[in-house]
Amino acid sequence: MFHISTLDQIKIAYIGGGSQGWARSLMSDLSIDERMSGTVALYDLDFEAAQKNEVIGNHSGNGRWRYEAVSTLKKALSAADIVIISILPGSLDDMEVDVHLPERCGIYQSVGDTVGPGGIIRGLRAVPIFAEIARAIRDYAPESWVINYTNPMSVCTRVLYKVFPGIKAIGCCHEVFGTQKLLAEMVTERLGIEVPRREDIRVNVLGINHFTWITKASYRHIDLLPIFREFSAHYGESGYELEGECWRDSVFCSAHRVAFDLFETYGAIPAAGDRHLAEFLPGPYLKQPEVWKFHLTPISFRKQDRAEKRQETERLIVQQRGVAEKASGEEGVNIIAALLGLGELVTNVNMPNQGQVLNLPIQAIVETNAFITRNRVQPILSGALPKGVEMLAARHISNQEAVADAGLTKDTGLAFQAFLNDPLVQIDRSDAEQLFNDMLQCIMQS
């Protein structure tokens, strides 16, 4: 059970506590949630960044939460009830190699953090980091609940369980939320019914992270799959943009043409953004992103975004201000509240397969809905993936398992086999080996 005696003495350990993204979202959501309070221990390899978040956090909300930068994992984790992990494995310079070095071989990636050459190399960087985190949780906070936001989600979460089998960990991702919003807008357009919240769209979710699928969807007991079939056929060529979004104006937006195309092929609704979906299978998407109306996200954009967030950090500190007190749209705080006994929640999480996805390997990290209540996360039986999707997902699961094992055992040969087996690596073996070695060399130098 948890260490807490009352809901005003909660301890959250934040690994990656210098984050200017996920950590600030948590601060925002905690600042408007009046159900609980306590301490947030901020641990980061960049201690100065954690100290800055301490200052900003302590100016956020009405003082219910005390933020403290700490210098060691032990200090962060000791007596923690909840552990949050959101780190960048390596640096943006490393990610520049992940995403852009394969372009010399004609391999283009829209994100490069999950699969493809970039996802595999990033995974190899992440494995020893997550192994260390898992051991520290085992030693200092074995009863805590762990929420991981770091990509590659499946590999990172798998390593947590491999190193500490008794861990209570879930991986959380917001990609499904965007598909719920798409379905909500479809209901309004096609049926003339306003959907107040995307959560009101009930979905059966299954697959692996960033390659997740919806096989059932409903609103007020209305079956939405036949309606989506018409919707997809109508917008398959032109695309459909969510209200307030324009795919040309943001590297994170799309017109859902990839999702519509995959639905026409496999008969289930892809529940991730087009940028992620496109990387899981070979085909025309990454060769012609503008035709399919999504973007390849350059690392130059991420570096510019980081610079702007650093400026915002300094501004908040000088002005002695905290984060904006508004909901981030993430579900982390609601998950924490449910785990602490403050209600129940059904949402999508990544956990070892215990049979919740019938036709994917047991113990592989799969994404499905789960029922969350006090000190319990129960995956919901979600059935089987369509056969064609199963074949695609199984290949990536094999690669993810190989990357986790290769990283833990330092088996370069196994790592290369996973690299060569990725669907985006459609080049000669000799070229693939040279690319792999060059990317691996960059890891060793970083």
Curated annotation (Swiss-Prot):
Protein name, per record: Alpha-galacturonidase
Record function comment: Alpha-galacturonidase able to catalyze the hydrolysis of the chromogenic substrate p-nitrophenyl-alpha-D-galacturonic acid (pNPalphaGalUA), and of the probable natural substrate alpha-1,4-di-galacturonate (GalUA(2)). Can neither hydrolyze pNPbetaGalUA, nor the stereoisomeric pNPalphaGlcUA. Does not display alpha- or beta-glucosidase activity as it fails to hydrolyze melibiose, raffinose, lactose and the chromogenic analogs, pNPalphaGal and pNPbetaGal.
Record InterPro entries: GH4_Enzyme_sf (IPR053715), GlycHydrolase_4_CS (IPR019802), Glyco_hydro_4 (IPR001088), Glyco_hydro_4_C (IPR022616), Lactate_DH/Glyco_Ohase_4_C (IPR015955), NAD(P)-bd_dom_sf (IPR036291)
Gene giving rise to this polypeptide: lplD
Cofactor annotation: NAD(+); Mn(2+)
Annotated keywords: Carbohydrate metabolism, Glycosidase, Hydrolase, Manganese, Metal-binding, NAD
Binding-site list for NAD(+): 10-72
Active-site residue numbers: 174
Note on how the cofactor is bound: Binds 1 Mn(2+) ion per subunit. Although a Mg(2+) ion is seen in the structure, galacturonidase activity was shown using manganese.
Annotated binding of substrate, by residue: 151
